[in-house]
């Protein structure tokens, strides 16, 4: 889990471009404002979705169905029930009664929740494509 020990929002700069140094990359993520960090919480799409949409990853959203790719729950599928941008974690409902936190990079989106019109516009999905994805079981 990310330690927020030296959290100082004034250290974050929107004009920061990139760095090879891992400590600066970590500093950028830790000190980012929550609305920016929320956009950074992205997960890769499944191969079928990637072929259909032509994009590799999207910001994760409550309602998406995902598959766990790493850890003890590898291979399990669940629905996203909560997102915590402060600790950079996504909570899933798996077979058990508990909610488990996962890092978004360790998940693959299987079904997109496209009920939100703004999300469809952001992903450039028109109504006909949305209906096609729904028919194939790739969208909710």
Swiss-Prot record:
* Any Gene Ontology biological process: translation
The UniProt entry's GO CC annotations, sorted and at most eight, read:
large ribosomal subunit
**Single GO term (MF):** rRNA binding
The reply to whether RNA-binding figures as a keyword in the UniProt entry is yes
Q: Which Gene3D superfamilies match?
A: 2.30.30.30
Work out whether the entry's keyword set contains Metal-binding.
no
Instruction: Give the family per the record.
Output: Belongs to the universal ribosomal protein uL24 family.
Partners and quaternary state?
Answer: Part of the 50S ribosomal subunit.
- By what name is this protein known? Large ribosomal subunit protein uL24
Name its species: Nanoarchaeum equitans (strain Kin4-M)
Q: Which gene encodes it?
A: rpl24
């Amino acid at each position: 889990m990310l330690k927020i020990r030296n959290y100082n929002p004034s250290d974050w700069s929107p004009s920061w471009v990139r760095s090879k140094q891992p400590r600066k990359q970590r500093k950028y993520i830790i000190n980012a404002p929550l609305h920016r960090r929320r956009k950074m919480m992205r997960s890769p799409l499944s191969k079928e979705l990637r072929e259909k949409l032509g994009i590799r990853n999207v910001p994760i959203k409550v309602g998406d169905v995902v598959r766990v790719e790493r850890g003890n729950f590898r291979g399990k599928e669940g629905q996203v029930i909560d997102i915590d941008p402060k600790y950079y974690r996504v909570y899933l409902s798996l077979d058990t009664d508990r909610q488990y936190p996962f890092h978004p990079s360790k998940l693959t989106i299987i079904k997109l929740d496209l009920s939100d019109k703004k999300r469809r516009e952001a992903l450039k999905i028109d109504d006909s494509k949305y209906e096609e994805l729904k028919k194939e079981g790739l969208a909710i």
